[in-house]
């Protein structure tokens, strides 16, 4: 927000210097980003009168001028502007003057052999406009001119200083000169002299579809779109960072800068030509745009709308994006004579969605997004109408109001005890003392709050401009501290805090990361935004920066494989990575997020050269699967494998569904050879993907992964081998579970040691051999005690799996 000090002084009494005022505003929360001293643009520039103008003897496009600058004798200046002539008053930069806008210091010299002792300036060279057709003619800017030789800065409005304030999202009142004036008055105690507003102008009801907004529309006749604004208005807009367009548009922008309420003017006659119908107040409505509707804004850019965008319509034709920008076809032009003046309160979320959907942010949208008081909508419309009447002698033919604004807020209880407890005592010469009630009341009333007594303190009704910010007791306490001065309160330490700790799930997740790193995998973090895919449906995001980041990812393994590709191309022997991240599925209206643990084991194992005779060795299926086994064993979790054949990314014969506690947890397998060939990856590439939520639930259910001491055995064990022929569909993990159940309590360990397939076994038959370890708790087991248990295991396998015993 650009704040003109001269304009501010017309609204509030300011006795402080610019530096002191900047310091106070910064300490109060309105950080001053920049101080622009406009007088520096015209330092050494004076009013001059062109007495004579002659053609340059050596150049057709140059003129030699005699200029009266209030000195004893006129000075000679060579000028290249085509609009210079005798009898006009112009700004003259004297020798030694510096023009910061163009980075030029004026020196005496010669141009094509003719002496020149100064420069006649354009508005661009004085930093007032971006482009100029020629030199500035002061007679056209003001009828009453100061004497020749007078500084030109006051005439051009350059005798001013502009503060650039950073306005936070919770202070929309800071986006208006009146709001800043109220803040300065509260900080300094200065008196306010604000423009008078008609708080209750006469209106008629508007009964059209308004899509949840408060909307007013005023018919004004007799304006002139070709007329420029008066100089004082243009100067205020320029200092506020707004370009002057014409008197009608400039008035709406002036009210926005002054009061903070954006307004918009429609050309009434253009609307009738555009729609082909007579236009009255009932012709206007507010609705959501239809997908594919075309809108051409005042910036002459063509945009395609969708249902996220809210539009103002005239006879159902979009004429403005609500709260953002009007259309080019309905805008005020030089031929405009009658207007419809819009003043509305659009819902901040709707304006924000519209602006983001179109990638368009304007002065109006930034104000609507922060929230505005509904009480100012009508008065600001009346304020603009009054200013237009002063400029054009135009007349209103009606004002219509419809819709509803936000619900009126009630008072907030401010407890005296809560304020003193939170702020503590003031540092005073006589020792610490609490802030007295009078000071508290003065701070709040200076903000425009209405106070009523309460047994615990005060009931405070915030003014409309601060209602969104002052909703809680702590908000009021902050305002008191801000106005009194944070540095005036003594420092006091907060109550001791108990040290924080990780939750069991956080501990388990951290343990997972440590375990995978200990097995040789590296943790990576990849982007959740990916390109579109022809193989699967992905959720598209709005306004993507790039086509490669236009959708939400559905898996992690695609990017993991790309990481492996890049590493192997960089002459790395192998690449093993894992990641904990989110995947997304569903539709844009109902996005489902799932946390997964995924990774890739690819390429050669990094073993010492003596272990493989100096040759690299790629991991086989069981070695790669052993990585997960070691991690799960450390968490005291047991995974079982089920054959998996319908996953297109995995080898159909070397893939498994991982089962935890009887429910699928994820999958593990070798990358499909076709995909490995397509990506130029080695065959020994393995993928895994686990449901993180289920994994953490199991790991933290009884905290069983916490190490506990078990006594060392004191008696020897006895091993027996058991080979059975079963159907190929029988998983080894199912057989192991049956063996463990039947072998209790003597069975200590069982493992698969051999698997054989052959024609001699029969169709769909396979031989699986297991090694069983038996051990007693306190005695050495004999065959007499082991054999009954071993027979029980055989019987269980025969019964459950129709196993044929081989040994």
From Swiss-Prot:
InterPro entries, A to Z: aa-tRNA-synth_II/BPL/LPL (IPR045864), B3/B4_tRNA-bd (IPR005146), DNA-bd_dom_put_sf (IPR009061), Fdx_antiC-bd (IPR005121), Fdx_antiC-bd_sf (IPR036690), NA-bd_OB-fold (IPR012340), Phe-tRNA-ligase_IIc_bsu (IPR045060), Phe-tRNA-ligase_IIc_bsu_bact (IPR004532)
Co-factor note (free text): Binds 2 magnesium ions per tetramer.
Enzyme class, broadest EC rank: ligase
Top-level taxon in the UniProt lineage: Bacteria
tRNA-binding domain boundaries: 39-153
SUPFAM superfamilies the record matches: Anticodon-binding domain of PheRS, Class II aaRS and biotin synthetases, Nucleic acid-binding proteins, PheT/TilS domain, Putative DNA-binding domain
Residues that bind Mg(2+): 469, 475, 478-479
Keywords on record: Aminoacyl-tRNA synthetase, ATP-binding, Cytoplasm, Ligase, Magnesium, Metal-binding, Nucleotide-binding, Protein biosynthesis, RNA-binding, tRNA-binding
GO cellular component, one term: phenylalanine-tRNA ligase complex
Catalytic activity annotation: tRNA(Phe) + L-phenylalanine + ATP = L-phenylalanyl-tRNA(Phe) + AMP + diphosphate + H(+)
Domain FDX-ACB: start-end pairs: 713-806
Boundaries of every B5 domain copy: 407-491
Cofactor dependence: Mg(2+)
Molecular function in Gene Ontology: ATP binding; magnesium ion binding; phenylalanine-tRNA ligase activity; tRNA binding
Single GO BP term: phenylalanyl-tRNA aminoacylation
Places the protein is found: Cytoplasm
Main localization (coarse): cytoplasm
Enzyme Commission no: 6.1.1.20
Family note: Belongs to the phenylalanyl-tRNA synthetase beta subunit family. Type 1 subfamily.
Quaternary data: Tetramer of two alpha and two beta subunits.
Entry protein name: Phenylalanine--tRNA ligase beta subunit
Species annotation: Synechococcus sp. (strain CC9605)
């Amino acid at each position: 927000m650009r704040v003109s000090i001269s304009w501010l002084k017309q609204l509030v009494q300011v006795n402080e210097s610019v530096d002191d005022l900047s310091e106070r505003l910064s300490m109060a929360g309105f950080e001053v980003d920049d101080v622009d001293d406009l007088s520096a643009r015209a330092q050494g520039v004076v009013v001059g009168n062109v007495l004579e103008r002659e053609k340059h003897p050596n150049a057709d496009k140059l003129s030699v001028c005699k200029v009266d600058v209030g000195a004893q004798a006129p000075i000679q200046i060579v000028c290249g502007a085509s609009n210079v002539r005798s009898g006009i008053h112009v700004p003259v930069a004297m020798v030694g003057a510096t023009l910061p806008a163009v980075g030029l210091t004026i020196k005496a010299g010669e141009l094509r052999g003719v002496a020149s002792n100064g420069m006649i300036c354009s508005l661009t060279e004085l930093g007032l406009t971006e482009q100029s057709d020629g030199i500035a003619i002061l007679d056209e800017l003001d009828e009453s001119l100061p004497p020749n030789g007078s500084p030109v800065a006051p005439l051009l409005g350059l005798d001013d200083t502009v503060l650039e304030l950073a306005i936070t999202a919770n202070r929309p009142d800071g986006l208006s000169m009146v709001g800043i004036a109220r803040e300065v008055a509260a900080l300094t105690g200065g008196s306010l002299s604000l423009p008078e507003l008609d708080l209750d102008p006469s209106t008629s009801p508007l009964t059209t579809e308004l899509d949840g907004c408060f909307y007013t529309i005023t018919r004004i006749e007799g304006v002139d779109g070709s007329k420029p604004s008066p100089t004082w208005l243009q100067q205020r807009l320029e200092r506020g960072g707004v370009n002057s367009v014409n008197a009608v548009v400039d008035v709406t922008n002036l009210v926005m800068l002054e009061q903070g309420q954006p307004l918009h003017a429609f050309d009434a006659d253009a609307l009738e030509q555009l729609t082909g119908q007579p236009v009255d107040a009932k012709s206007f409505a507010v609705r959501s745009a239809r997908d594919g509707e075309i809108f051409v804004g005042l910036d002459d850019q063509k945009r395609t709308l969708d249902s996220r965008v809210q539009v103002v319509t005239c006879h159902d034709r979009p004429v403005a994006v609500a709260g953002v920008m009007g259309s080019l076809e309905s805008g005020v032009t030089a031929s405009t004579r009658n207007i419809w003046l819009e003043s509305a309160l659009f819902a901040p979320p709707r304006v924000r969605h519209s602006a983001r959907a179109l990638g368009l942010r304007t002065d109006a949208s930034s104000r609507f997004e922060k929230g505005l008081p509904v009480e100012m909508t009508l008065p600001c419309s009346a304020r603009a109408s009054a200013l237009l009447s002063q400029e054009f002698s135009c007349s209103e033919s009606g004002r219509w109001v419809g819709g509803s604004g936000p619900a009126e807020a009630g008072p907030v209880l401010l407890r005296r005890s809560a304020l003193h407890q939170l702020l503590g005592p003031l540092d005073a010469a006589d020792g610490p003392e609490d802030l007295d009630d009078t000071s508290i009341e003065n701070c709040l009333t200076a903000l425009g709050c209405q106070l009523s007594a309460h047994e615990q303190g005060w009931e405070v009704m915030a003014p409309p401009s601060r209602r969104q910010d002052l909703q809680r007791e702590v908000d009021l306490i902050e305002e008191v501290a801000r106005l009194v001065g944070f540095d005036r309160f003594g420092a006091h330490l907060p109550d001791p805090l108990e040290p924080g700790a990780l939750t069991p799930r956080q501990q388990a997740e951290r343990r997972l990361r440590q375990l995978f790193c200990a097995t040789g995998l590296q943790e990576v973090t990849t982007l959740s935004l990916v390109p579109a895919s022809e193989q699967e449906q992905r959720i598209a995001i709005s306004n993507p920066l790039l086509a490669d980041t236009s959708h939400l990812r559905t898996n992690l393994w695609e990017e993991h494989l790309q990481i492996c590709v890049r590493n192997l191309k960089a002459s790395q022997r192998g690449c093993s990575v894992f990641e904990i991240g989110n995947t997304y599925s569903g539709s844009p209206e109902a996005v489902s997020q799932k946390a997964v643990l995924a990774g890739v084991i690819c390429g050669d194992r990094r073993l010492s050269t003596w272990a493989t005779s100096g040759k690299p060795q790629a991991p086989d299926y069981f070695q790669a699967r052993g990585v997960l086994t070691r991690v799960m064993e450390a968490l005291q979790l047991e995974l079982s494998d089920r054959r998996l054949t319908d996953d297109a990314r995995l080898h159909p014969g070397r893939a498994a569904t991982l089962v935890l506690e009887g429910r699928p947890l994820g999958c593990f397998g070798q990358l499909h050879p076709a995909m490995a060939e397509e990506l130029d990856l080695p065959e020994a590439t393995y993928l895994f993907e686990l449901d993180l939520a289920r994994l953490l639930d199991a790991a933290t259910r009884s905290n069983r992964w916490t190490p506990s001491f078990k006594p060392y055995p004191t008696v020897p064990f006895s091993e027996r081998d058991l080979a059975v022929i079963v159907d190929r569909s029988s998983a080894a993990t199912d057989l192991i579970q049956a063996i463990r159940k039947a072998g209790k309590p003597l069975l200590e360990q069982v493992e698969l040691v051999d698997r054989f397939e052959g024609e001699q076994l029969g169709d769909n038959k396979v031989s699986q051999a297991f090694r069983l370890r038996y051990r007693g708790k306190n005695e050495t087991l004999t065959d007499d005690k082991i054999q009954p248990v071993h027979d029980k295991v055989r019987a269980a396998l025969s019964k459950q799996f129709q196993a044929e015993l081989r040994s």
